[in-house]
Amino acid sequence: MRFELEGRIIFSKDVSEETQKDIIEVLENGDIFLKGVPEGKENEASKIEGYEFEGKDLKLNMTSGTYTRAHEGIVRLKKPIMEKVGRKHQIGIRDVAIDTYVVTITATPSKVAELKGLKVPECEVELDNEKIKILFKNLGDGELKRNIIDRAIKFVKTELDKQEQDLTFEVCKIAPGTIVSDYKATREITFDKDPTELAEPYGWVKRFPGRGQWFYTAPMAKLFRAFESLIVEECIEKVGFDECLFPKLIPLDVMYKMRYLEGLPEGMYYVCPPKREPEMFRDFVNEMMIKKEIPIDKLKTLLRDPGYVLAPAQCEPFYTFFDHELVDVDSPSKFFDKSGWTYRWEGGGAKGLDRVNEFLRGECVWMGSPEFVEKVRDDTLKYAEKLAEKLDLEYWTEVGDDPFYLEGRKNEDRGIEFPDVPKYEMRLWLPHVKDERKGVAVTSANIHGTHFVEGFGIKDYKDRKVWTGCTGYGLSRWLIGFLAQYGYNYEDWPEIIQKKVGKLPEIPKLITWP
């Protein structure tokens, strides 16, 4: 894909010549756009092709490939510019505006021709032989925050790939996105702020240097544990799960058997064990001490090939436990784990407290007959909905379009049995999103059919059908949904939460933070 942007960063006052000089230093630092870009793909990151100052405006012409796309690049400039000139020149940034933006997707002429007459909201589409051009005009900060550009691109690519849709659309008997249940809060929801924007000023979280990671301080940690306890008591224990402690460092061979490497290989953290050669590491340390920087290239030579991933799904050890074992579906298994973090590489998609690379969940996994597996899935979802109603949290449940074990996969050649609905997803309403009814996914209830049973060679001793299922209760997202509807005022919280939390602890007392 090719991205071409003409836009403006709009300041709070006219930009003086001295301020311009400092801003130009930032603009000429191309490294700003290289964070998160894979080695060898630097030429696909954002580039500033030209710029001009006019009154309060910094006019920019930018281009990019698929990494740090131009509309992400112009937003990424805000922080380093403000760090450079904000306090020094007493100037702020009022808005980011995109005047024109052209996204070009290349495909075969026959596929492009199939899109004739395609209408996409809030943009225009032009077709030209092998090129699909998506044209945007007059986009502001609000449209960027609503991800209009990404949604339009996804919509066009989905139309383009309809003949090669993910297995989800082939398998699912109910259209993904269909709402199957919902609940309206009985109280008036008056809080309408973005909980992420308030969490740090209140001292409940602090940004961690890693992308998509946060330091959760004592008040937030107390709320985490309150929700964890509630979910265990009100959902997990009522379905009769037994707690286990699952490993979080997963061998690549396990991910291969799960076929996760086929569907979402770009969504994991890969782990490279070090070579046990102290002398070579001594050289690494010496160079670091002298240069006062980490010699990354030397470090690469001291690492073995990737052998593991950090658990991206949390349920991986369950299937390994039963690898090539004989089971009895009359004695089904129900395990749950809440012992640590789950990791997914969201790349540029990581944002706020709801879309993070490191998050906590209560993960339930079970195995048994198809009827048993379907009933357990329904129960795990039912109790999650009851908990939301008990807390008077507005929610809806829909048919999911991205079961983790099918995501990104186009075909299945093993004759696997799939359920009629692989995934239900429960979402808590986010009142602060004004332009659409948006929710944060807090519970994902999945049935895998025989997908993992086949992959791990699991059989019933009487050769009866064996299915598996898993439900993830996303603690991080339950918190965000709760705070989005109730806010941070303890007195406004429902009594059940107040009792679980007890007295809220103090935030850390620092001179310079929060």
Swiss-Prot record:
Species: Methanococcus maripaludis (strain DSM 14266 / JCM 13030 / NBRC 101832 / S2 / LL)
Enzyme Commission number(s) from the entry: 6.1.1.11
Role, per record: Catalyzes the attachment of serine to tRNA(Ser). Is also able to aminoacylate tRNA(Sec) with serine, to form the misacylated tRNA L-seryl-tRNA(Sec), which will be further converted into selenocysteinyl-tRNA(Sec).
Molecular function terms from GO: ATP binding; serine-tRNA ligase activity; zinc ion binding
Entry's Gene Ontology cellular component terms: cytoplasm
Protein name: Type-2 serine--tRNA ligase
Family that this chain belongs to: Belongs to the class-II aminoacyl-tRNA synthetase family. Type-2 seryl-tRNA synthetase subfamily.
Localization, UniProt: Cytoplasm
Binding positions (ATP): 344-346, 355-356, 477
Lineage: Archaea, Methanobacteriati, Methanobacteriota, Methanomada group, Methanococci
Keywords tagged on the record: Aminoacyl-tRNA synthetase, ATP-binding, Cytoplasm, Ligase, Metal-binding, Nucleotide-binding, Protein biosynthesis, Zinc
Subunit structure as annotated in this protein's UniProt entry: Homodimer.
Note describing how the cofactor binds: Binds 1 Zn(2+) ion per subunit. This ion is coordinated with 2 cysteines, 1 glutamate and a water molecule that dissociates from the zinc ion to allow the coordination of the amino group of the serine substrate, which is essential for catalysis.
SUPFAM superfamilies recorded: Class II aaRS and biotin synthetases
Biochemical pathway: Aminoacyl-tRNA biosynthesis; selenocysteinyl-tRNA(Sec) biosynthesis; L-seryl-tRNA(Sec) from L-serine and tRNA(Sec): step 1/1
Entry cofactors: Zn(2+)
CDD domains: Gly_His_Pro_Ser_Thr_tRS_core
Residues the entry annotates as binding L-serine: 313, 344, 361-363
Record-linked InterPro entries: aa-tRNA-synth_II/BPL/LPL (IPR045864), Ser-tRNA-ligase_2_arc (IPR004503), SerS_tRNA-bd (IPR041293)
Known catalytic reactions: tRNA(Ser) + L-serine + ATP = L-seryl-tRNA(Ser) + AMP + diphosphate + H(+); tRNA(Sec) + L-serine + ATP = L-seryl-tRNA(Sec) + AMP + diphosphate + H(+)
Gene Ontology biological process terms, A to Z: selenocysteine biosynthetic process; seryl-tRNA aminoacylation
Free-text domain note: Consists of two distinct domains, a catalytic core and a N-terminal extension that is presumably involved in tRNA binding.
Residues bound to Zn(2+): 315, 363, 470
